[in-house]
C-alpha cells in the first residue's frame, strides 16, 4: 500500500502528539495545536459550504497572520489549491493573478479590502470575497463575508476527497518584473520533500519558536508554514517587518529561529542601539563585551544564493557566532 506524501500529515501528527502545545501566536491571539487544527477543519467545511471543491483555486492577499497560516492546511485538505499573492503588488497585478489562476474565492486582509472591491468587476469567475479582518458595513452590504463569523458557524467535519501526491497544492506567482507574473505549480509531494530536506539540514524540536520575518506568500514561506508544524514548534506571526517589533518578539516570545532575506538582516543589524537594547535591561547591556564571541550564541545559516560576504560579516559581528551554508 502506498501512502501519498503530503505536508497535511504534519498537522495531523502535531495534533496527536502536541495537542496542548502552543502552535500559533498572532498579537494577542494564542492557539494550541488542537485549537489551530480545529479552526483549519472548520474553514475547510465552510469553504465546501461555499461551493469550493477539489481543484478549485482560493486566492489570499494578506500579511503574516494566523488566518493566512490556516489557509496552508484548510484549503489543500479539501483538494483545493491555494494561491498566496504578494500583497506588495498593485491592483492590476492582483487582477491578473486572480484571473489567470481562476480563483473562485478571494480572502483579503483589512489593508486590501478596498482594492479588491475595486477590481471585483474584472473578475467574473470569483464567486465569494472574504474579509479576514476589518469588514466594514458598506463592504458587508456589497456581499463580503467575515472570516471569523463564517468560521464560527461552520462545523468541524468536512468531506475529505482522495488526494494524490502529484495533486496541486499551491500556485505561487512571480512578481512579474520582466513580464506578467508567472505561476509556479507546487504539488503535495513537492512541498513534503522540501520540508523533509529542510528538517535534515536544520535541527528543530517542539521547543523551537519561529518568528515569521519571511512572507508566507514567498515560496510558501520557504515551506516553513509546514516545517515548524512538522517539528511541533510555535509559529509567531509578524505582520510587518520592523526592527523594534522583531527585537521585542525575540525577547518576549523566546524566539529561537527566523528566516530573512539579506535586506531584512541588514535592517536588523542597522537597528538603532536603543532598539537592540530591548533584548536586555540597560544595566545588563552596559556590561556586555564588544567581542562577538561573548555575545548571544546565534547560528546564522545561508541557503540557496547566499548573501554578500559583507552582509554575513555584519550579521556575525552584531549577533555573534559564525554562519554556515545549510543547503543549496
Give short role names for the model-derived ranges:
Residues 19, 131, 152-173, 180, ...:
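Conserved pre-ATP/AMP-binding loop-to-beta segment of ANL
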Residues 230, 255-260, 269-328:
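Gly/Ser/Thr-rich phosphate-binding loop
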Residues 32-34, 169-193:
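Conserved AMP-binding A3 loop
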Residues 192-209, 217-257, 267, 271-272, ...:
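Conserved AMP-binding/adenylation subdomain of ANL enzymes
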Residues 1-5, 137-168:
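Flexible, low-complexity linker/hinge segments
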Residues 10, 49-50, 77-152:
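Structural core segment of the AMP-binding/adenylate-forming
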Residues 56-57, 63-83, 87-91, 99-105, ...:
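A short helix-loop-beta submotif of the ANL/AMP-binding
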Residues 3, 20-65, 69-73, 90-95, ...:
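Conserved AMP-binding/adenylate-forming core of the ANL superfamily
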Amino acid at each position: 500500500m502506498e501512502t501519498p506524501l503530503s505536508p497535511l500529515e504534519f498537522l495531523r501528527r502535531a495534533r496527536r502528539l502536541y495537542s496542548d502545545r502552543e502552535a500559533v501566536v498572532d498579537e494577542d491571539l494564542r492557539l494550541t495545536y488542537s485549537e489551530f487544527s480545529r479552526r483549519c477543519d472548520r474553514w475547510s467545511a465552510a469553504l465546501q459550504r461555499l461551493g469550493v471543491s477539489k481543484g478549485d483555486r482560493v486566492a489570499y492577499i494578506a500579511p503574516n497572520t494566523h488566518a493566512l497560516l490556516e489557509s496552508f492546511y484548510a484549503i489543500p485538505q479539501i483538494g483545493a489549491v491555494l494561491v498566496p499573492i504578494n500583497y506588495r503588488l498593485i491592483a492590476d497585478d492582483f487582477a491578473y493573478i486572480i484571473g489567470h489562476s481562476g480563483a473562485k474565492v478571494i480572502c483579503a486582509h483589512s489593508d486590501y479590502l478596498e482594492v479588491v472591491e475595486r477590481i471585483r468587476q474584472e473578475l467574473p469567475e470569483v464567486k465569494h470575497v472574504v474579509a479576514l479582518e476589518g469588514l466594514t458595513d458598506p463592504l458587508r452590504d456589497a456581499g463580503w463575508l467575515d472570516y471569523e463569523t463564517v468560521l464560527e458557524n461552520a462545523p468541524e467535519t468536512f468531506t475529505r476527497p482522495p488526494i494524490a501526491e502529484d495533486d496541486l497544492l499551491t500556485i505561487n506567482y512571480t512578481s512579474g518584473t520582466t513580464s506578467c507574473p508567472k505561476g509556479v505549480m507546487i504539488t503535495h509531494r513537492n512541498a513534503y520533500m522540501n520540508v523533509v530536506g529542510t528538517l535534515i539540514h536544520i535541527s528543530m524540536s517542539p521547543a523551537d519558536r519561529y518568528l515569521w520575518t519571511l512572507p508566507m506568500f514567498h515560496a510558501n514561506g520557504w515551506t516553513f508554514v509546514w516545517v515548524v508544524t512538522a517539528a511541533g514548534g510555535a509559529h509567531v506571526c509578524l505582520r510587518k517587518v520592523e526592527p523594534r517589533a522583531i527585537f521585542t518578539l525575540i525577547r518576549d516570545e523566546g524566539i529561537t529561529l527566523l528566516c530573512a532575506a539579506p535586506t531584512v538582516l541588514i535592517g536588523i543589524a542597522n537597528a538603532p542601539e536603543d532598539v537592540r537594547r530591548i533584548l536586555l535591561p540597560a544595566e545588563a547591556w552596559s556590561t556586555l563585551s564588544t567581542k562577538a564571541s561573548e555575545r548571544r550564541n546565534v547560528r546564522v545559516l545561508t541557503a540557496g544564493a547566499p548573501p554578500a560576504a559583507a552582509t554575513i560579516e555584519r550579521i556575525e559581528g552584531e549577533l555573534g557566532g559564525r554562519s554556515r551554508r545549510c543547503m543549496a
